[in-house]
Swiss-Prot record:
<dbReference type="GO" id="GO:0005524">
    <property type="term" value="F:ATP binding"/>
</dbReference>
<keyword id="KW-0276">Fatty acid metabolism</keyword>
<dbReference type="InterPro" id="IPR040097">
    <property type="entry name" value="FAAL/FAAC"/>
</dbReference>
<dbReference type="InterPro" id="IPR042099">
    <property type="entry name" value="ANL_N_sf"/>
</dbReference>
<comment type="similarity">
    <text>Belongs to the ATP-dependent AMP-binding enzyme family.</text>
</comment>
<dbReference type="GO" id="GO:0016874">
    <property type="term" value="F:ligase activity"/>
</dbReference>
<keyword id="KW-0067">ATP-binding</keyword>
<protein>
    <recommendedName>
        <fullName>Medium-chain-fatty-acid--[acyl-carrier-protein] ligase JamA</fullName>
        <ecNumber>6.2.1.47</ecNumber>
    </recommendedName>
</protein>
<keyword id="KW-0443">Lipid metabolism</keyword>
<keyword id="KW-0547">Nucleotide-binding</keyword>
<dbReference type="InterPro" id="IPR020845">
    <property type="entry name" value="AMP-binding_CS"/>
</dbReference>
<dbReference type="GO" id="GO:0070566">
    <property type="term" value="F:adenylyltransferase activity"/>
</dbReference>
<dbReference type="GO" id="GO:0005886">
    <property type="term" value="C:plasma membrane"/>
</dbReference>
<dbReference type="Pfam" id="PF00501">
    <property type="entry name" value="AMP-binding"/>
</dbReference>
<dbReference type="InterPro" id="IPR025110">
    <property type="entry name" value="AMP-bd_C"/>
</dbReference>
<comment type="function">
    <text>Ligase involved in the biosynthesis of jamaicamides, which show sodium channel blocking activity and fish toxicity. Initiates jamaicamide biosynthesis by the activation of the starter unit, 5-hexenoic acid, followed by the loading of the activated 5-hexenoic acid onto the acyl carrier protein JamC. In vitro, can also use 5-hexynoic acid, heptanoic acid, butanoic acid, hexanoic acid and benzoic acid.</text>
</comment>
<dbReference type="Pfam" id="PF23024">
    <property type="entry name" value="AMP-dom_DIP2-like"/>
</dbReference>
Length: 592
């Protein structure tokens, strides 16, 4: 069998179907435990062709289709059904019938922005939504619906391959909208094929690899590395729902142990969740020695999480060099940089005062004379990616010891944003001021390169600037959550709000449900204020403690700081109890 060259994802799946027809491609684990159904490459190809025939009857090539599916194999078939029809797929989080008022607006915005012609879903989700017809907008009522799991496989015989090539749009990846309105990132077949070759090399996928994923399929991490990469590499993938993982994170680790999984991924909170929500008794039966690549990306990677996860799970076979901190974004298809094979995750200890001035000063971890920040390396850029650190205002390259905006150049970069010419030009066609070099894609993220490795410090739009000093919200949020055991990890936001002509620091933080009846507000607020002052030399103007599960988040779980800011100003945060005034040692008034 000669080495294959693929122009499109259709070519890729048809190759697998022809040469590895009976090999298991995907299996679904009900409740994250029991394998209830699976698809071979041949079966997936047949289902995709059947769905494509139905699509080709109802819509024209290059029209858009919204995919609303629970996590599972039917989504994968629908995605490839769209590709096989030459229709642009739009993976999206299905609306929750119980919380339609909260989950529908984002979907309606996507539907309107993409001008989708059809919605694909399965029978169970279709039935749920039809029961909620009165709450659906006119946009949802007017559009065509296709229930894909009711399409007979026999239709596959009528499929005609669409006239597409490597530059054809495969799907729109709507960004999570952590700092803005979601935008549709346009990804071509060439973007995806090219990028999968990078990932295969960077994360060491081989023909004997085995994958599992629970990361949502509508998120770039779950879609590209979780689902498409196993197909590209020709390896089996075990799929479970995010809810199954979140309710009992041990299920993820048990799946890795049971099926001898080599590759799986998750954002930092997933590794933290495993630390907090698994017991010694549950961990006792794990064997994680097969896990070669545990990638950690999609949100800031915390040094404390990395070290604690390794220390906790090393006795059960987890290897220190298996944890791969990574950096990426949908606009780059997925991955920009990650740790090298065989090396430990690198952590730099930086002088906090210098970092506030966008300077990089490395100090000893044992340094007691000054406040320090720990920053985890996300490794060198993958493949042939070119990364530049640029002053976002002058558009000139930063000095090696300076923090700047991360710019990226590579064929994996997306075509642009759907129907947003100005934003596409600004983001994807940037050139360096002094040399004209480019075009680069502007990430909007801040960081620096040291010894060829990329370190991330924050988002430009989230940086808190008070009295001329830069403060990264994630650093303050970590300080806050560690200040009292009642505060939920990764469920807080540090914000800057202008009050009486001056930028002030606001802290919004969720409280654990178990503390609802016993919480001493004065103690918690006092701890928060003291910790932030000690660690960051900042005065907290206002603390708002809110109910568990109420902080604004994106569909992929990222804190929406901009939405928190709006809700704070509107007074619409779901507070733990009525706002009261607490006086700090310094005499400043704080809300709680």
């Amino acid at each position: 069998m000669s080495k294959p060259e693929f122009s499109t994802l259709i070519d890729l799946l048809q190759y697998r179907s022809h040469y590895q027809s009976a090999r298991k491609a995907y299996s679904f684990l009900q409740n994250g435990e029991k394998e209830v159904n699976s698809l071979s490459y041949k079966e997936l190809d047949e289902k995709a062709r059947a769905i494509a025939v139905e699509l080709q009857k109802q819509v024209d090539r290059n029209e858009r289709a919204l995919l609303l599916y629970p996590q599972g194999l039917e989504f994968i078939a629908a995605l490839f059904g769209c590709l096989y029809a030459g229709v642009v797929a739009i993976p999206a989080p299905p609306p929750d019938p119980i919380r339609l008022k909260r989950t529908l607006p984002r979907l309606e915005a996507i539907l309107f922005d993409a001008q989708a012609s059809v919605i694909l879903t399965d029978f169970s989700k279709y039935s749920q939504l039809k029961e909620s017809t009165s709450e659906l907008s006119s946009e949802f009522k007017r559009i065509k619906w296709i229930v894909s799991d009711k399409i007979p496989t026999a239709l596959s015989q009528k499929w005609q391959k669409p006239d597409i090539n490597s530059d054809t749009l495969a799907y729109l990846q709507y960004t999570s909208g952590s700092t803005s309105t979601p935008k549709g990132v346009m990804l071509t077949h060439k973007n995806l094929i090219h990028h999968c070759s990078y990932i295969k090399e960077a994360w060491g996928y081989t023909s004997d690899s085995i994958a599992t994923t629970w990361v949502p399929h509508f998120h770039d991490y779950g879609l590209v590395d979780g689902l498409i990469q196993p197909l590209y590499s020709g390896i089996p993938c075990y799929v479970m729902s995010p809810i199954a993982f979140y309710m009992r994170p041990i299920r993820w680790l048990q799946t890795i142990s049971r099926y001898r999984v080599t590759h799986s991924q998750g954002p930092n909170f997933a590794y933290e969740h495993c630390l907090r929500r698994t017991t010694a008794e549950q961990r006792a039966n794990l064997d994680l020695s097969s896990w070669r690549t545990a990638s950690n990306g999609a949100e800031p990677v915390r040094q404390e999480t990395v070290e604690n996860f390794i220390a906790t799970f090393e006795p059960f076979g987890f290897r220190r060099d298996a944890l791969y901190p990574a950096y990426g974004l949908a606009e780059a298809t997925l991955l920009v940089s990650t740790k090298k094979h065989g090396e430990k995750a690198r952590v730099l200890t930086l002088a906090a005062e210098a970092l506030e001035k966008n300077r990089i000063v490395v100090v000893s971890p044992a340094e007691k004379e000054q406040v320090v920040r720990f920053v985890v390396s996300c490794g060198p850029p993958i493949g042939g990616m070119k990364v530049a650190i640029v002053n976002p205002f002058t558009l000139r390259k930063c000095q090696p010891d300076q923090v700047g905006e991360i710019w990226v150049c590579d064929p994996s970069m997306a075509v642009g944003y759907w129907n947003r010419l100005e934003e596409t030009k600004k983001t994807f066609h940037a050139n360096l001021a002094e040399s004209g070099e480019g075009p680069f894609m502007r990430t909007g993220d801040l960081g620096f390169l040291k010894d060829g490795e990329l370190f991330i410090t924050g988002r430009i739009k989230d940086v808190i600037i008070i009295r001329g000093r830069n403060h990264y919200p994630q650093d303050i949020e970590l300080t806050v959550e560690k200040s009292h055991p009642s505060l939920r990890s990764s469920h807080g936001a540090a914000l800057a709000v202008e009050i009486k002509g001056e930028e002030r620091l606001i802290v919004v933080q969720e409280v654990e449900r178990s503390y609802q009846k016993t919480l001493d507000i004065n103690e918690v607020v006092g701890n928060i204020r003291e910790a932030v002052t000690d660690e960051h030399d900042l005065q907290v103007y206002s603390v708002v403690l809110i109910k568990a599960g109420s902080i604004p988040k994106t569909s992929s779980g990222k804190i929406q700081r901009s939405a928190c800011r709006v809700k704070f100003l509107e007074g619409t945060l779901d507070q733990w109890e009525a706002r009261v005034k607490v006086t700090s040692k310094s005499g400043a008034a704080v809300s709680s």
